[in-house]
């Protein structure tokens, strides 16, 4: 056994009897959410881990995150400079579930659902109602669902909306739901932010206060993988370190990203949505052919 392959085996020791990182051995795993999920880096990291650790496992991972979307159905006046209201998950969820037919769904909403206003019980109830509806719809389709708490809102200097507190409340409510699987990335990001602020008072996870950068997506992926049982992930500080046993971890991850992004846009286009100004994806037949070609290259890394 080559030195790198030997290291690869040792890196993931303890999971030999597990067929994949996802519970219940699903064949079709769906990630749904807003622009943070559409950006997709945290999903891509999870996919890279799954495919690196279990190269023989045939599993499809879908990302149909949609920028601006809410599960509350709310939209602020003048959203997107008045060009369009926020899309509502209620409009497309049935099509998503029907066309993808997932076995397992990861869902993360909340960032847009309070429409960037102070905490208000009416808006909060709309969020709760939307989450409960989504939970029921996913279960009715025969799939399992794992909720992910919203990421952080970092207020700008001299801003005093208190929207960070809104997301604290939304996240806390989610974690208190009985018999639900909930991954608390919100608290993990807050802990990380607090630690970094002690070193650098100007540190930010997101430049605009909403959309995490690569480091934020890495922390989200780490918390999700840790929840799913990847205990060794806590010791790792980057995607490259996670994939270090490969000869060229960057090339491997780049292939995952290219394939993921192409399929993401194709599925969004095929399923349909009410969000203007989105990239048109390739027709699914063409996208699937390209995806197969990329998958062959990805699998070469684990032979």
Identify the residue ranges that each predicted region occupies.
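Substrate-gating cap/lid alpha-helix
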Residues: 155-187
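Oxyanion-hole/transition-state-stabilizing segment in secreted/luminal serine hydrolases
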Residues: 31-32, 43-44, 73-76, 83-125, ...
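Solvent-exposed loop/turn segments at secondary-structure junctions
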Residues: 35-38, 66-72, 104, 111-116, ...
